[in-house]
Amino acid sequence: MTQTLSQLENSGAFIERHIGPDAAQQQEMLNAVGAQSLNALTGQIVPKDIQLATPPQVGAPATEYAALAELKAIASRNKRFTSYIGMGYTAVQLPPVILRNMLENPGWYTAYTPYQPEVSQGRLEALLNFQQVTLDLTGLDMASASLLDEATAAAEAMAMAKRVSKLKNANRFFVASDVHPQTLDVVRTRAETFGFEVIVDDAQKVLDHQDVFGVLLQQVGTTGEIHDYTALISELKSRKIVVSVAADIMALVLLTAPGKQGADIVFGSAQRFGVPMGYGGPHAAFFAAKDEYKRSMPGRIIGVSKDAAGNTALRMAMQTREQHIRREKANSNICTSQVLLANIASLYAVYHGPVGLKRIANRIHRLTDILAAGLQQKGLKLRHAHYFDTLCVEVADKAGVLTRAEAAEINLRSDILNAVGITLDETTTRENVMQLFSVLLGDNHGLDIDTLDKDVAHDSRSIQPAMLRDDEILTHPVFNRYHSETEMMRYMHSLERKDLALNQAMIPLGSCTMKLNAAAEMIPITWPEFAELHPFCPPEQAEGYQQMIAQLADWLVKLTGYDAVCMQPNSGAQGEYAGLLAIRHYHESCNEGHRDICLIPASAHGTNPASAHMAGMQVVVVACDKNGNIDLTDLRAKAEQAGDNLSCIMVTYPSTHGVYEETIREVCEVVHQFGGQVYLDGANMNAQVGITSPGFIGADVSHLNLHKTFCIPHGGGGPGMGPIGVKAHLAPFVPGHSVVQIEGMLTRQGAVSAAPFGSASILPISWMYIRMMGAEGLKKASQVAILNANYIASRLQDAFPVLYTGRDGRVAHECILDIRPLKEETGISELDIAKRLIDYGFHAPTMSFPVAGTLMVEPTESESKVELDRFIDAMLAIRAEIDQVKAGVWPLEDNPLVNAPHIQSELVAEWAHPYSREVAVFPAGVADKYWPTVKRLDDVYGDRNLFCSCVPISEYQ
C-alpha cells in the first residue's frame, strides 16, 4: 500500500521512541490481560464519569529535530548580557569534563534518590564529598546533602532555630536588613504559617528587640559588605539566641568560617561552584549545623556505615527525621533535594582542589580590588570599605550609567538608592573590568589594569584581617588528587559504575514514574541562551524564557483542566506547600481564616501531612476501607465534625493504592459541601494525562511533578519541579515574587522559592516532551503505562498477590504486591526480595509504601515488553527461591535472599553457603551483569555511629 507524504514525514516518530512496547508487543500484552485495545482497557479501568470526551488541545506531535529547531528559535529571543547583578547568582565556568561526564550523562541524571544504598554508592560518595566541602567551609560539625535553594534553606534555618531554641516562649525571628531580598521574601512566607513575627533591622540593633528565638545574619551583605559578627554572635549566644548565617560559598574559600565565630547554623547557595545561573535554577543549597542539633536538621544526610561483610559503605542517615516516616512531625516536607547539582558542585571542588579554588577566589577578589581602586581614583565613592566580590558604587548620574551599561550589554544591580551594585565572578576578565570603567567613568578614563594591580596587590585592605581564613580547607585526599582531566574523568566513571540508573535497567519504583528522559529533551538545558541568564535580569532580556514558560503553562492548563499554572515551586513538596498556601489565603480572603483542618487519607504520601503542617494546618486522617479506597462514611463524618473549620482535603489520584477510586467525584462534592477545597496530589498524573484531569474530576488545586509525568530526570534525588495548577478562584493566591514582577507572575503573594520561576532552566525538558508527543502521544503514554502495570500484575498475581484492584480486577499505572503472606510462611521479607533483585540487575520497587510489607511496582510506558518480561522472570525466579527456603532446601538464615546482594569479591572468597556461587551472582536470566560494590547495609550501625564526612580513601578500596 502506498503511503502518503504525511505518513512518510512521520511527525509522530518520537511517540514510538518514547513508548517502550511497539504495536505488536502492546497487542501481546493486551491479549495477556484480556483486553481488545488500549481504549477498551482504559475504558474498563477509568470511571466512566471522569473520562474526557475529547483529548486536551495541546497540538500535534513534532519530530525531535523540528521541536529542537522550534525551541532554539524561542531561546534565541533571550539576550545574553553580561550580568554583574549578583544577589546570590553569578556566572560560572562549568568544567567541560563535568559537563560531559555528569550533567550530560544518563548514568548520573536518570538515577533515583539513594534509598537503596547498595546500588547508589557512587552518588552517595559524591554527596559525602559535598558534605565535606560544606563542613570545611562553614566550620561546623554536621552538613546535609543539599536543600532546594538558598532562600528555602533560610526558611528551614528559621524553623530549625525554633525547634532547638531553649527560649520556648519567644516567637520573634530577627533578620538582618542586608540579607538578599528574595531570602527575606521566602522567610516571611514561611514565618506567616508558623505564626512567627519577623523583625527586619540593622544587625547591630538586634539586641534592642525582645522575645527573639533566632537571628539570621549574612556574612557578605546583599550589597557586598563583609561583616565581622564575632562579637555580636558571642553576645547573642550568651542570651541563648540561635544564630544562623547566610554565606557565599566562594567567599568562604578566603573568609573566616562562620562556625568558628560561633554560628549555630550556616547555609548558602552552591551555585557558583560550577552550576549555571539558568534563570534561577536548579541550584543546590548547602546547610550545616552544630553536632548537638543534628536530629533537628532538615534534608538528607549521608552517613558512613558498614555493610554485612564489615566493609565501609554509605547510606542516607537518620531517615526517621524525614517526612516519609514522621509525616506531619517531620523536620521538613522536603522529598526532592538537589542531588545532581550538589554533585556538580562537589566535583567542581574535587577538580579544582583547595589550591585551584583559592586561585579562583583570589582572582575574583583581585579584580574587584582593581575595579574599586580605579573608581576611587577617579572620585567615585564606595558604600563599603570591606568586600569580597561586590561593590556598591555611589553614582551621581545613575540613569546615564545604566544607559551606558545597557548599550554595552551589561547588567548592573539597579535597585540601590543613588548607587549601583557590581558583582564579579570567575568568568570576569581584565577586559571586563576595563569595560566597567568605561561604563562608570566614560571612555577617556585613562586607567591601566597592570598599574592598578601593582597598587592593590600588596596593600589590599578590603578584607578585614580578622576575617581572613587561617585554617586549611579540603585537606582530604579526594580534593587533592583528581586535577588532570584524565584522572577526573576516570574518578567520575568509577563513581558512575557503582550505581544503577535507567541507562542500565528499568527502575520499577511505585509512585515515582521513572520513565525515559530522552536525549532530545535534555539537549536544550545546556544551551547558553537558557543556561546563562540571571533570574533578575530585565524582563526584555528574557523574552524567550517568558514565551517558553507561557507555552508550557498553557499546555499544562489544558492537560490539567485548571485555569492557571504557577511555575515557582521547585519541588513536588514545595508545590504542595504553595497549593495549600493558596487555599489558606483564599479562605482568609473570604473572612474564613479559621478554616485550618486538612483531611488526609491514611494512605497518603508522607509529604502531604508534612506540607499541611508547614502551611499551618491541623491534620485529620480519613480512614480507608478494606479495598484501599477512601471510606466515604468516615470522610463525611470527619468533614461534618470539622464543619466551619474544614480547609481542604489532600487526595492522590489514582490513589496511592494503585487504583482509580470510583467515588472520587463524590469525595470532591462532600468536601465542597462543607466549604473545603480539594487538593489533588499530582504524583500520579502519569495515569491521567489525556484520559481525565484534576480539574474535570472536581479538584481546585494540584501540584505537578514535572520530574515524573513530564520527563525531567530525577538526577539521583533532584532536581525536581512542582508547579501548581489552580482553578480561577485560587489564582490570585499563588506565590509571587518581591524582586521580579512581570507577566506570568500571577499575584503579589509571598514567594516559596528564591527565583520567580523556580528551576527555570529545566522547564525546556517538559516543553520538549509535550511538544514532541502532542495530544495523541500523551494519551497513548498514559494508556501504555496502565497496560504495562496490568501486564505485570496479571503475570505476577499468582506468585505475589496484588493487594488492591479496581473494577474487573484491574490496577491503574502501578500495582502493590503483598509480601506479608510469604513472610508469615517463610520468613523471607520484602527487604530480602528487594535486595535479591539487585543480583538480577534491577532496582527494587518501592518498599513498604503505602502499606508495610509490600512492594509497589510502576513500570511506566517507556519500558518494552522485553524488559517487563525480564523483570517478571526475575520476580518469578525469586519466588521459586523462596519456595526452596520454604521447603527447607536452604535454611532461612543462609540463602540467596537473606544474603543478597552478592558482590564480586565473594567469587574468590571462601564459600560456605548451601547454594552455589553461580546461583548467587548469575541467577537465571542474568546476561548483562550489574555488580553492586557493597553488601547489604547495616542501618542500625550507621545511625548509632553517625559519621557524615569523608573517610580515608583506603576505606573505599
Swiss-Prot record:
* Keyword Oxidoreductase set for record: yes
Gene Ontology molecular functions: glycine binding; glycine dehydrogenase (decarboxylating) activity; pyridoxal phosphate binding
Keyword entries, A-Z:
Oxidoreductase, Pyridoxal phosphate
EC number(s) in its UniProt entry?
1.4.4.2
Q: What class of enzyme is it?
A: oxidoreductase
Read off the Pfam families from this record.
GcvP2_C, GDC-P
Q: Which SUPFAM superfamilies match?
A: PLP-dependent transferases
Catalytic function, reaction form? N(6)-[(R)-lipoyl]-L-lysyl-[glycine-cleavage complex H protein] + glycine + H(+) = N(6)-[(R)-S(8)-aminomethyldihydrolipoyl]-L-lysyl-[glycine-cleavage complex H protein] + CO2
The answer, when asked if Oxidoreductase is one of the entry's keywords, is: yes
What positions are modified (N6-(pyridoxal phosphate)lysine)? K708
Instruction: Fetch the InterPro entries from UniProt.
Output: GcvP, GDC-P_C, GDC-P_N, GDC_P, PyrdxlP-dep_Trfase, PyrdxlP-dep_Trfase_major, PyrdxlP-dep_Trfase_small
| GO annotation, biological process | glycine decarboxylation via glycine cleavage system
Q: Which GO terms describe its cellular component?
A: cytosol; glycine cleavage complex
Which cofactor is recorded for it? Answer: pyridoxal 5'-phosphate
List the HAMAP family.
GcvP
Q: How does it assemble?
A: The glycine cleavage system is composed of four proteins: P, T, L and H.
Q: Which family does it belong to?
A: Belongs to the GcvP family.
What is its biological role? Answer: The glycine cleavage system catalyzes the degradation of glycine. The P protein binds the alpha-amino group of glycine through its pyridoxal phosphate cofactor; CO(2) is released and the remaining methylamine moiety is then transferred to the lipoamide cofactor of the H protein.
What is the official name of this protein in its record? Glycine dehydrogenase (decarboxylating)
Organism annotation = Escherichia coli (strain ATCC 8739 / DSM 1576 / NBRC 3972 / NCIMB 8545 / WDCM 00012 / Crooks)
